[in-house]
Amino acid sequence: MAPPKAASHRPAVRRKKSGTLVDSILDKYLNVRFFKYLLLEPAALPIVGLFVLLAELVINVVVIQRVPYTEIDWVAYMQECEGFLNGTTNYSLLRGDTGPLVYPAAFVYIYSALYYVTSHGTNVRLAQYIFAGIYLLQLALVLRLYSKSRKVPPYVLVLSAFTSYRIHSIYVLRLFNDPVAVLLLYAALNLFLDRRWTLGSTFFSLAVGVKMNILLFAPALLLFYLANLGLLRTILQLAVCGVIQLLLGAPFLLTHPVEYLRGSFDLGRIFEHKWTVNYRFLSRDVFENRTFHVSLLGLHLLLLLAFAKPTWTFFQSYVRLRRIEDQLQPQIAQQNLELKAQKRPKKVEKDKDKDQKKFTTEQQSFLKAFEKSLQKASGGKATPAPAQAEPERYGIHFDRCTQLALLPFFLCNLVGVACSRSLHYQFYVWYFHSLPYLAWSTPYSLGVRCLILGLIEYCWNTYPSTNFSSAALHFTHIIPPYQL
């Protein structure tokens, strides 16, 4: 009788274990606590980011399929590239319906490729899907930076990404070149923070070769080079940027250099008042006055000088923390290996150089203090010590020190945008993805931060711009730098 009795008990045991596992999963993930973690904890952004990308894929497809495409510059881009593909290298002769070609050579090459892929520019729907891919790729790069820094709660980025009609319109309904330039820029920023300097310089120079607004990041990048690399290696990276520009512009520089430089790097170009987003309250005469333009340039330079010292301090602190990371990471890895070995049932042999791999008292104190400071900065609570005596693995998110690098870059760009002679609607992508970071770097309350982002979105969605929307946009540009 014993065997049947034993057999009858086995299924019951299995069902109990299965039920316990399911209950454990449900208790761990399907509850309010985990939902709050996903929304509020910056450390959850890698998980939330995957859902954001999937949702954005659906949103972009719906926008492309349901919202009519608006022709603004796409045909003109194709006409300008067609002239180049037909053998014209004189920039003064490359024109489209909206005027002459005013972008550097990388723009010509990229849109020439799109010219062929889209059947001489006629397959606009295919171009829209290509730009949807550009949007998703750039968003992935942006989310990677935010995940590293752990500065902004995930719900902020979710709301920011899903609620901006203007951004989706610029990418998949207008096909401007600004998204291409910004994509290359964020690729460069990721590479710089990974300390892949030459590749980062290459992408940065390519971004400048698509549109010159990327140069707004250049002052911060110069200081970042100097802080990380020193003078000689900085000169080398600047040479990389310069050589790439020469290679890109070679077909034009070797044939009609003056026309190329005058056309693609024209800093004195006059913008049309009817398209301005930020200076609607000015008369056309004042808007086009060169004294006004020089005044804005002077203000830009003064603000850059004012922020130069704190920027340098931030970058120096970033470099010091990276060096500490390089020193401690091998020891952290070794310490975790030893802890893992201690958990094994086998006898651990005596290690001759045991003390060499152990942390010193100063290093242990630094790790504890640094971890507490990072938890405090992100609003997280310290993890309570476990009741059991089993040792825990050492771990620290050193990438959070990227906060010291990202803020100066984003602030430098914001200063340039705020001092621009004119902003057109597609220029919103220049700084849109950095706005949550800038807002959450201020000491303002949650309500004020959200108000700033909402007001900026309102200003860029007001078409045509009004005196109020232009003035409000300037107000929102002043608030973050004033506190930072």
Swiss-Prot record:
Membrane side Cytoplasmic: residue ranges: 1-43, 119-125, 193-211, 255-294, 425-426
Pfam family name, one: ALG3
A single GO BP: protein glycosylation
GO molecular function, one term: dol-P-Man:Man(5)GlcNAc(2)-PP-Dol alpha-1,3-mannosyltransferase activity
Superkingdom assignment: Eukaryota
TM segment ranges: 44-64, 98-118, 126-146, 172-192, 212-232, 234-254, 295-315, 404-424, 427-447
Signal sequence residues: none
Localization annotation: Endoplasmic reticulum membrane
Record's bilayer topology term: Multi-pass membrane protein
Annotated pathway: Protein modification; protein glycosylation
Enzyme Commission number, as recorded: 2.4.1.258
Catalytic reaction(s) noted: an alpha-D-Man-(1->2)-alpha-D-Man-(1->2)-alpha-D-Man-(1->3)-[alpha-D-Man-(1->6)]-beta-D-Man-(1->4)-beta-D-GlcNAc-(1->4)-alpha-D-GlcNAc-diphospho-di-trans,poly-cis-dolichol + a di-trans,poly-cis-dolichyl beta-D-mannosyl phosphate = an alpha-D-Man-(1->2)-alpha-D-Man-(1->2)-alpha-D-Man-(1->3)-[alpha-D-Man-(1->3)-alpha-D-Man-(1->6)]-beta-D-Man-(1->4)-beta-D-GlcNAc-(1->4)-alpha-D-GlcNAc-diphospho-di-trans,poly-cis-dolichol + a di-trans,poly-cis-dolichyl phosphate + H(+)
Record's function text: Probable alpha-1,3-mannosyltransferase involved in the N-glycosylation pathway. Involved in glycosylation of the TNF receptor grnd, regulating its ligand affinity. Required for normal epithelial growth and architecture. Suppressor of JNK-dependent intestinal stem cell proliferation.
Additional observations: In strains Harvich and Apxo, there are 2 genes which code for l(2)not/Alg3 protein. They differ in their C-terminus.
Family as reported in the entry's similarity comment: Belongs to the glycosyltransferase ALG3 family.
Record-given protein name: Dolichyl-P-Man:Man5GlcNAc2-PP-dolichol alpha-1,3-mannosyltransferase l(2)not2
Organism per entry: Drosophila melanogaster
Lineage: Eukaryota, Metazoa, Ecdysozoa, Arthropoda, Hexapoda
